[in-house]
Amino acid sequence: MRREYNEYIKLLLYFLDPEKIPYVLESEKKQAHQKQADCYKPDSPAYFNSDKVLETQFLLTQILKNDALRHRIISGVCTWEGCSFATERLLQTITDAAELAKVLITGVLHNKDKSIKEFVFAPVPNFIFTRDIGITINDHLLLSNAATAARERENLLMKFISFYHLFAGNEDKLIEISESSDFFLLDENEQKDFKTSVEGGDVMMIAPNHLLIGCSERTTPSAADEVIHKIFSNNKTGVEKITVIKIPRHRAVMHIDTVFTHVRKDTWVLFGKFSERVGQERNDKQFAYYRYFLDKDYVPEHESIEIFRFYKPLTETYLPGKDYLIDISDKVKGLESLLRNISIEDFGIAENDVKIIYSGDNVFPHDEREQWTDSCNLLALKNGVVVGYDRNDETFKAFVTNGFSVIKANELLKKFENKELTPADVKDTLIVLPSAELSRARGGAHCMSMPLLREKI
């Protein structure tokens, strides 16, 4: 897994901070005998320390150097995790910021000989999926509120990092989401219905004035409601359009970024089962009589997608009691037509030039199998250059059919190192990472990133 993730990090450095590459290559060469070169270790003095490719553990280390803040963070984490006072006092004795940051993430205390002494609380391995802990909305940052207890510590740590590092001095640009003030009055069943959780995989800053929000297994209607009010009440976010996409509450499609991602202005990758066009084509080919005989509440997955568009011009005064829902049914019939509409309206693409690439080339069983291994969860490094996993062969074929190249990350890195190519030369390409371990964690390249600054395209 380390090798896989290092390849991903090196790729990001080549595209975003190439000045760090000579140092990383030299470090790898000197420490080829080690499992992990020190340049990749956030707790090492030899860490590459880029200001463009940031690591949460390193950022946490920086704020832990402040004694007053260190005590607050330890106290907050221990309270959150239900630790004993004795455990909290033990953590307070760790004065080395790098060591403490590692403990707060892994939950592991070590003896002086580096052997494991004990677990003080569970690790947070999902911290690798930084997409979910925050969402950049132009120059603002929306902080997530996790749906599951396993990720709550990540939210707490990210709040400290955001308030005291990333947005220090600009705290007014941070947007927080929390439970309603009367949530505690609800009974257990009502609390399940009105829980407020939002995760970054369900929020896409798809254009400078257009935000997408998914209602899913992880992001609740209550959270979508609060985000809409928070955004529309703050014109400084620059957002006029908010489109909410309601998808089935399944783990296989826990966020909307597991169902589709943007590849190029005119191109998207999409899970075909959620496409109304694909559903209609299948029905036209052979009518599905079985639908008459199933439970009355049965709805095919592509028909269970619901889309809502809300619009408030920046020039208009926000009224909390006003309904900003607008009717787009004449141009958006489902998820695929929404993606086409975004390319047309937000990026100026001609209707006939919009391309949809389907997971597994829309062929069973590859479509579902490859969606499960993140064929739709791609990270765009620039317009038309995306990163994914190396195990989705039928999706690769669909990319090639649509005019894209597919190359393994290690092969591309060798071309960069040999001066055969530069990142600027790479166009219309799917770069694939090794994923024997990474894919098991249920998150792809899109999940493993949290863009803070985006170039205009």
Regions found by a protein language model. Name each.
Residues 1-457:
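The feature marks the mature, well-folded catalytic cores of soluble enzymes
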